[in-house]
């Protein structure tokens, strides 16, 4: 039996605010399928909180909903951006607020689904106003961290200001660079700026948070099945098409979706298919590990399911959600 950890929130006291469901969890845990079934049952719309599923050219590699799903339920913030365009968490926050308001007008239940920590953190804790970073400074930071390595970069950043590395893993290049950039521009850490600034929050809504949090082994098995299915669905052709666009537009090394770089090297005959699959699955496992760490420390759920969502446990999931969240 799945053990549930319920928060201390008293749902009966939250009736006056508009209800929003968040379905979160590591990659390949069944979030999208659960969102679809909930949306069908409770007159909902599905809003994307995955940073890779926004791109038009990557429906297969980013595991976007299929055409059948789009036809059954309205999906928002999926498959709308060209691969070479920048898109910040601030932009996502503005769009998601708009979609929530539209759903409220139509009396639809917003179901926000995804595993991108930055998106979910902003949604729940508000938009933090940080200074703009010049491109030249970004490039400088990248060169430094490549030269000295993330651990040395971490130590040097810590010497400047201890709060610059607050809650940052020494191997997390992205967050280390972001922290360094902010400090170079403002002479303050992100932690210090957040304490000073007012944060724009969505206080007029009730967020009911569902976390699918199965053992890693189950997720790794799902990742393997999903990768095999991606190849069958045409992931290689998807990458081939994008490589042509990259060359035509001279927009290289912008795509971060797992599997793209690996299949690109396969098409360039740098690796065989077995090696390509091994590298992709290892990258996926590494990503899942980071997600597990983030959800464990940064996401307080109302319900936690300790298994992947599948057809065989559909009734159980839906009943628990109805009884614990949606009856009040």
Regions inferred by a protein language model and the residue ranges of each:
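Phosphate/pyrophosphate-binding catalytic cores of soluble transferases and nucleic-acid-acting enzymes
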Residues: 2-328
């Amino acid at each position: 039996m799945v053990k549930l950890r319920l928060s201390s929130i008293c749902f009966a006291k939250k009736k006056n605010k508009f209800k929003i469901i968040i379905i979160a969890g590591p990659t390949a845990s069944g979030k999208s399928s659960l969102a679809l079934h909930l949306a069908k049952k409770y007159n909902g719309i599905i809003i994307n909180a995955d940073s890779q599923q926004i791109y038009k050219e990557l429906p297969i590699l980013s595991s976007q909903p299929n055409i059948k799903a789009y036809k059954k339920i309205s999906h928002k913030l999926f498959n709308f951006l060209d691969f070479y365009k920048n898109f910040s968490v601030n932009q996502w926050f503005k769009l998601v607020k708009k979609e929530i308001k539209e759903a409220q007008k139509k009396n639809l239940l917003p179901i926000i689904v995804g595993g991108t920590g930055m998106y979910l953190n902003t949604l729940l804790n508000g938009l933090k106003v940080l200074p703009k970073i010049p491109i030249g400074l970004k490039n400088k930071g990248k060169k430094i961290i490549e030269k000295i390595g993330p651990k040395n970069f971490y130590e040097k950043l810590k010497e400047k200001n201890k709060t610059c590395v607050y809650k940052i893993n020494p191997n997390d290049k992205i967050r280390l660079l972001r922290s360094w950039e902010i400090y170079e521009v403002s002479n303050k850490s992100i932690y210090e700026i957040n304490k000073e600034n007012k944060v724009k929050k969505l206080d007029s809504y009730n967020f009911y948070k569902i976390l699918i949090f199965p053992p890693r082994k189950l997720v790794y098995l799902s990742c393997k099945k999903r990768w095999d299915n991606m190849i069958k669905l045409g992931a290689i052709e998807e990458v081939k098409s994008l490589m042509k666009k990259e060359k035509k537009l001279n927009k290289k090394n912008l795509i971060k979706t797992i599997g793209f770089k690996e299949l690109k090297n396969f098409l360039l005959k740098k690796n065989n298919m077995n090696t390509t699959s091994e590298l992709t699955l290892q990258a996926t496992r590494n990503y899942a590990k980071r997600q597990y760490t983030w959800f464990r420390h940064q996401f307080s759920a109302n319900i936690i399911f300790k298994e992947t969502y599948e057809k065989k446990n559909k009734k159980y999931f839906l009943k628990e959600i109805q009884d614990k969240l949606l009856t009040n």
